[in-house]
Regions:
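Carbohydrate transferase catalytic cores enriched for Leloir-type hexosyltransferases
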Residues: 1-369
Length: 369
């Protein structure tokens, strides 16, 4: 019998640093509950998450609220609490959708971890002073524990898989079992709305998001193009950042999820810059909302998007200008074709099936096609 304890008790949509990880955690819980060969599924949830879960009857929800009440509660959960609950549930597997094992205790059951990226390792090399030393040390030890103590690791992309394997080799750890499960999206029920003469720029205070570079590129594009609309800047930036002012720049800060979707839908193009990602969700969401994305041509984003969207080189202002001009002239029919292609490639049903199939293999059980 295949049984899984699934931990989402340490997540809170109001405080999460990654809405993508939160969406994966809730969506995957739902589609795992729909997998016929997963016979037992216990969801360790909390009062902020349970209302976002749509589960089949086989799933049993147990609320554990202390991990979201304080930092110490979260640390206790990470290092001891989740293992205590996994032992009590007596399922053979514990699934960690945030991807971090305890580095203090050994798991009482087999662990399957979903690792989204190794951003902390990237920052330790590229921006070593950005993350506080204690926090950086904590997550570095958690990543090592995940590589060493997981029976299997799932990732969102081939790029993330290669990063994990490289990390294991470079640190002298035993090569882990890493399976690309992928990431999923659902069709947008509403038809694309009427476009306004606006461009949406995702901004972020994290240095790997290259906000200053994107603003610089857009400033030149505004100067050289005949675009007379508005640049909506979605997200938070460092207080020390010198933001452009004037009627064409609209700095919004952080907004609710529903409002961000509307901002994407009304824009003629979405700009997403980055130098490191494990997958890259916003460009896909832009296409699904009927808007052309302009995005950095880094490995993970190119893998995720395939032949869709308008990529540009972070090292080339001219490639950005060309990508913007292509995006604003993109035909709605092309965007519809891209949307259908991306939905075929990235489905939650396929993600959960890959995960369950691998757990069945690990258990020596037969996979039913």
């Amino acid at each position: 019998m295949l049984g899984v304890t699934y931990s989402i008790a340490d997540q809170n949509v109001a405080t999460t640093k990654s809405i993508g990880i939160y969406n994966l955690s809730t969506s995957l819980a739902q589609t795992l509950s729909e997998q016929p060969q997963l016979e037992r599924l216990t969801i360790l949830s909390n009062k902020t998450v349970s209302s976002d879960l749509t589960l089949t009857a086989k799933a049993r929800v147990e609320e554990c609220n202390y991990p979201i009440l304080s930092r110490w509660g979260r640390i206790w959960w990470d290092q001891w609490g989740v293992y205590q609950r996994a032992r009590a549930e007596r399922n053979p597997w514990l699934f960690l959708p945030k991807g971090f094992c305890s580095f203090v205790a050994r798991p009482p059951v087999k662990v399957a971890a979903y690792v989204h990226d190794i951003m902390g390792n990237f920052y330790s090399r590229r921006y070593p002073s950005y993350i506080p030393k204690l926090e950086s040390h904590y997550f570095a030890k958690s990543l090592r524990a995940t590589v060493c103590r997981s029976s299997v690791i799932f990732t969102n992309s081939n790029f993330s898989r290669s990063e994990l394997l490289d990390f294991a080799r470079q640190t002298g750890l035993k090569e882990p079992k890493v399976i690309v499960a992928g990431f999923g999206f659902r069709p947008i029920k509403e038809k694309p709305g009427e476009k306004q003469n606006r461009v949406l720029l995702f901004v972020n205070k994290a240095p790997h998001k290259l906000t200053s570079l994107a603003v610089s590129f857009l400033t030149r594009w505004l100067r050289e193009s005949n675009f007379n609309g508005v640049i909506d800047c979605l997200g938070t930036v460092s207080p020390a950042t010198q933001n452009p002012t004037g009627p064409q720049w609209n700095w919004l800060g952080r907004v609710a999820l529903g409002q961000s979707r509307e901002l994407i839908r009304r824009a003629r193009a979405v700009v997403y810059s980055s130098e490191y990602e494990g997958f890259g969700i916003p460009p896909v969401e832009a296409v699904l909302e009927g808007t052309c994305p302009v995005f950095s041509d880094i490995p993970a984003l190119c893998e995720t998007m395939g032949e869709t969207g308008c990529p540009f080189s972070n090292d080339s202002e001219s490639s950005f200008l060309a990508a913007m001009n292509r995006a604003l002239s993109m035909a709605p029919a092309t965007l519809q074709e891209w949307s259908e292609s991306l939905l075929q490639r990235h489905t939650w049903a396929a993600v959960s099936k890959r995960i369950v199939d691998e757990l069945l293999v690990q258990e020596g059980l037969q996979i039913i096609k």
